[in-house]
């Protein structure tokens, strides 16, 4: 593995290896830590605002012995129109790796292609691979190693956003059952479904059907960054998909609710449900550190060869 650009690019074995390493690095935190990034500088190139992604990467890089360098696109020449390939070729001669949080998937892929250094997708409009790895890590902590393979996982809300797409690719690679519950116009198009080609991913417009028997129920904001102008015109379609007590009555016994945060209480999730599952949701956020440390360490080891 030379880059992490999407869950799609990974094999099932690579995902399992990253999860195992994430568990190990979390257990070792504060003692017997590896320093695979010692002497290295990693850039965090962000076009979008961030709390969890920025902090978790800065902490993870530092704990692995490296130096994080935060670069907002508004502070570098990318923000003034310099081509990505030029920025990539410059930084590739100066730093050891980069995590990029931006809009278009093609931007991350172009940077990786031209920089020649390990590149991590820290979120695009198409995928959010680091969050999915953190979520899978959290599932294993709650239910046991590899427990996802025997469970149904549900995602309700916008069925065609970066989180739902990354969940679909994880289901494809790992073989668990995934139900996507979303309004008709917010389910993936047929072209994507044909490309995915995965019988264990179920699409439905019925939120109850999606959640029925699910051990893990995921949701996300209805308006992703950059979609704020759509406002009420988009939100009105999603209220039947709100994660609330009534919907969760159809989930499996012992279920958990996941949210990648930030959450808008009273919209995609009710206040009482979020607070009830806060220990899970905020563990999920913490595990961004450990999942990303696993990615960083794996990329550094591959680079050394």
Swiss-Prot record:
One of its GO terms (biological process) is citrulline biosynthetic process. The keyword Cytoplasm applies. GO terms for cellular component: cytoplasm. It is found in: Cytoplasm. One of its GO terms (molecular function) is amino acid binding. PROSITE patterns: CARBAMOYLTRANSFERASE. It comes from the Bacteria. The keyword Cytoplasm applies. Reversibly catalyzes the transfer of the carbamoyl group from carbamoyl phosphate (CP) to the N(epsilon) atom of ornithine (ORN) to produce L-citrulline. Belongs to the aspartate/ornithine carbamoyltransferase superfamily. OTCase family. This is Ornithine carbamoyltransferase. The gene is arcB.
């Amino acid at each position: 593995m030379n880059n992490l650009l999407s869950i799609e690019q990974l094999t099932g074995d690579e995902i399992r290896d990253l999860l195992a390493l994430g568990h190990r690095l979390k257990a070792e935190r504060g003692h017997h830590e590896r320093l695979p990034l010692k002497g290295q500088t990693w850039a965090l190139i962000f076009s979008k605002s961030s709390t969890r992604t920025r902090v978790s990467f800065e902490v993870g890089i530092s704990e692995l012995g490296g130096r994080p360098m935060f670069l907002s696109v508004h502070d570098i020449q990318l923000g003034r129109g310099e081509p990505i390939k030029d920025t990539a070729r410059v930084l590739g001669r100066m730093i050891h790796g980069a995590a990029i949080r931006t809009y278009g998937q093609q931007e991350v892929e172009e940077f990786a292609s031209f920089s020649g250094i390990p590149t991590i997708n820290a979120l695009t409009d198409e995928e959010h691979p680091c969050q999915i790895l953190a979520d899978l890590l959290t599932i294993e902590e709650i239910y046991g190693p590899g427990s996802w393979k025997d469970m149904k996982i549900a995602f309700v809300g916008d069925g065609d956003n970066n989180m739902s797409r990354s969940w679909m690719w994880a289901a494809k690679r790992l073989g668990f059952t995934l139900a996507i519950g979303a309004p008709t116009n917010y389910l993936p198009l047929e072209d994507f479904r044909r490309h995915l080609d995965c019988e264990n991913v179920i699409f439905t417009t019925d939120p109850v059907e999606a959640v029925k028997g699910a051990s893990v129920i995921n949701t996300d904001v209805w308006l992703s960054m950059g979609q704020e102008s759509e406002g009420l015109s988009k939100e009105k379609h999603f209220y039947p998909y709100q994660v609330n007590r009534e919907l969760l009555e159809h989930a499996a016994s012992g279920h958990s609710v996941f949210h990648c945060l930030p959450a808008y209480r009273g919209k995609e999730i009710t206040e009482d449900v979020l607070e009830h599952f806060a220990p899970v949701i905020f563990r999920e956020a913490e595990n961004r550190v450990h999942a990303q440390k696993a990615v960083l360490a794996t990329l550094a080891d591959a680079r050394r060869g």
